[in-house]
Amino acid sequence: MLPTVFIVSDGTGITAETFAHSILSQFDQKFRLVRVPFVDSLEKAYATVEKINEAAVHDGRRSIVFTTLVDSESNEIVKRSNALVLDMFQRFVEPLEQELQLKSSHAMGRGHQNADTEEYKTRIEAINFSLAHDDGQSNRNLSEADVILVGVSRSGKTPTSLYLAMQYGVKAANYPLIPEDFERGKLPSALAPHRDKLFGLSIDPQRLSEIRNERRPGSKYAAPENCRYEINEAEAMMRREGIKWLSSTHKSIEEIATTILQEIRLERQSY
């Protein structure tokens, strides 16, 4: 029987779930995750306790609960459940209040009340920009890009660009390096004026072949020898042009994005 983990929040629960994943990944154990978002009333808090207690009876063991409930009364109700309750706000906010000698707002959903703010608009603009400049489909306004990701097809450029836009409000374009570029031995002409904004992604050739085979099985495009050729040529070009790059093979999107932000010295725009 897998241990049951509840993610309880008065909002979407994204913060609590991200934190829970980070903590639980330290243990060689699978868990059954139950998400309980929008617990924004006492009635919902009591209903949540019922769910938690039912799980404890069913599992024959206490559940684990990660909470980000701002309302203290709702929080106390949930803490009375038959579970190990890990209260992120009490753990972090109260020490900060003492250190800063300030009282926090204790307002529910404060972090998400940004629909009309400049940060939100910046993020939406960045997403639209990244979608419009995905896979080299548009060369217009490349000068507005914060970063332009380059690399062979299927090396992780698109998901990384969108993650940078959605999470950080970064205008991230991406542009493919193709065999014709390697034959010419130089960057595509559209990229040359923006050399200082380029960041490269590479990938293990064998892994690239596996990914491409899912898209075009048995094709030259996915053949191991072709993947080796493209990767070798792309990395040689990036070294020759002085472009910073990394291998995406064993890195998560989050790790790739964080590395890119550090390398290009971009401050995070949205939070």
Curated annotation (Swiss-Prot):
Enzyme class: transferase
Binding site for ADP: 151-158
Recorded catalytic activity of this chain's protein: [pyruvate, water dikinase] + ADP = [pyruvate, water dikinase]-phosphate + AMP + H(+); [pyruvate, water dikinase]-phosphate + phosphate + H(+) = [pyruvate, water dikinase] + diphosphate
Keywords assigned: Kinase, Nucleotide-binding, Serine/threonine-protein kinase, Transferase
Gene Ontology MF terms: ADP binding; ATP binding; phosphotransferase activity, phosphate group as acceptor; protein serine/threonine kinase activity
EC number, as in UniProt: 2.7.11.33, 2.7.4.28
Domain of life: Bacteria
Pfam families: Kinase-PPPase
Family statement drawn from the similarity comment of this UniProt entry: Belongs to the pyruvate, phosphate/water dikinase regulatory protein family. PSRP subfamily.
NCBIfam families membership: PRK05339.1
Function (record text): Bifunctional serine/threonine kinase and phosphorylase involved in the regulation of the phosphoenolpyruvate synthase (PEPS) by catalyzing its phosphorylation/dephosphorylation.
Protein name: Putative phosphoenolpyruvate synthase regulatory protein
Species of the source: Burkholderia multivorans (strain ATCC 17616 / 249)
